């Protein structure tokens, strides 16, 4: 027959330490924890094999293709500092293994069956280098940062948002009322909670109508362009597009999608619809912590963020560094840059394993949301800079005088921080002082400062290098 049947070590075929990576290869950095007795080279090679062309035994049909052309290769392995039995395995995948413009297909290969592999105790995808040749097959974000600013006519400051709470249980009319109060008070955006879809207490069409009414009323009063993220996420792609179409017919500026629970295929379809029809697209990352929170297994959020930029979204939630949800500062800033910038240098101190060139794919605005309030404003302004959306749910609606004064307090705090920064003051050191000064002439801000002066969410971050 002319082929050698039987099982042979993966490392004989898939571990190639002298391989020179190509500009068109997709490169992956995996954190591998092998089972006791499995050498790291074999574990790394097994990952490369099982996520590309390999299977557990030699097969006759191997002779009908060119393994050299199509196989994934583990080209470098390094131990993880401070961990006994963990290694970073670098794998290069030939471009031809992937369907153009499909995040779904890319993930099915790279993070598919290989994560259940018995020879590994745990496996985590830490980073991906997407080559320009592959980036160019994606539309990416429907509009991007600059186009969004032009649509909204807002420059030189972060944008302000608020998630409407209680997240479930309000009727459509009361929901619209809450939206109106927040927007009238000075916020740029309000947001459907990620789990608001179309439930018995509030069907989607009613919510869309009342929110649109609130939006137009607030715009007329304030003379500013306003938005409400209408969550189009649904049980089927057809229903999702139907909701997006209705949003477009109402003339609203932005819709929203839960990209992990909704899935990459649905998300990419919606992103294409949004670009074709002039809608901005806000992305919520519900379910991300299931995938990214374990340090030794899963997928790091920076990879999910890159995947979203390819699939398409104009905003994505990315942690706060200071609020109630997970996020270590340098690492968060690393993937915030991956979302916004066109070219990002490799920087291991921020968890960035590869240089990434997005070749003019539009950028995504990071959204800081979760347990933040007016006292955090100086830190948020400093950490995230102008190109971001700062979202205060409880930090707006929890104001003792109601939603509109809560919105006023946040807007005053933000404008004070931006002004102080532009005057050259140090927000990190003088932040509290800046907020106190501003609260002297804003009773709304003074009341907010009083309510939240003692609140802290301080735990050790899990997401360390």
Curated annotation (Swiss-Prot):
Its main location: plastid. The disulfide bond which can form in the large chain dimeric partners within the hexadecamer appears to be associated with oxidative stress and protein turnover. Mg(2+) binds at residues 191, 193-194. The modification N6-carboxylysine is found at residue 191. Its cofactor is Mg(2+). InterPro entries: RuBisCO, RuBisCo_large_chain_AS, RuBisCO_lsu_C, RuBisCO_lsu_C_sf, RuBisCO_lsu_fd_N, RuBisCO_lsu_N_sf, RuBisCO_lsuI. Heterohexadecamer of 8 large chains and 8 small chains; disulfide-linked. The disulfide link is formed within the large subunit homodimers. PANTHER family: RIBULOSE BISPHOSPHATE CARBOXYLASE, RIBULOSE BISPHOSPHATE CARBOXYLASE LARGE CHAIN. RuBisCO catalyzes two reactions: the carboxylation of D-ribulose 1,5-bisphosphate, the primary event in carbon dioxide fixation, as well as the oxidative fragmentation of the pentose substrate in the photorespiration process. Both reactions occur simultaneously and in competition at the same active site. This is Ribulose bisphosphate carboxylase large chain.
